[in-house]
Amino acid sequence: MGYMAKESRYDTMQYNRCGASGLKLPMVSLGFWHNFGDTGHYDNMKAMCRTAFDHGITHFDLANNYGPAYGSAERNFGQILKDDFLPYRDELLISTKAGYDMWEGPYGNWGSRKYLIASLDQSLKRLGLEYVDIFYHHRMDPETPLEETMGALDSIVKSGK
């Protein structure tokens, strides 16, 4: 039998509304910046996720370039999701983001529509998911009009990703 979350996981964690949305964030989130790359130990990653969720931490925060190597944190967490957390997907708040270097060429970072949509599509593949709950633009782009960046994010939300 696989992982079974503690029944008491929601007994002590406090949750706060995320802005004016219907989402509620736990007081503590688990971020995967340099903790879940290929240089880490998979069993430790899995244990961290289990312990976090067993204590009411439902928000798991990633980015397309978290690792090292780029994308490896999403891939490793995607495997943990598949192994342990798919039965609990509706209880999880999974976020990822894009904006920093990810691949070579003029569309490998920043905030163009092309980069953001391609980044999210790649993130979803690595995570093994059809959607994320929050997709952030990681930083301002001095060369792309804000309207283009915001339009891309709006399109992503409307597409259900």
What is the role of each PLM region?
Residues 58, 62, 96, 144, ...:
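Ser/Thr-centric signal marking residues that sit
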Residues 1-92, 158:
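N-terminal binding-site loop/beta-alpha segment at the start of enzyme catalytic domains
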Residues 19-37, 95-108, 131, 136:
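N-terminal small/glycine-rich loop or linker at the start of catalytic domains
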Residues 94-95, 153:
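Residue-level signal for alpha-helical context at structural boundaries
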Residues 101-161:
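Glycine/proline-rich, positively charged
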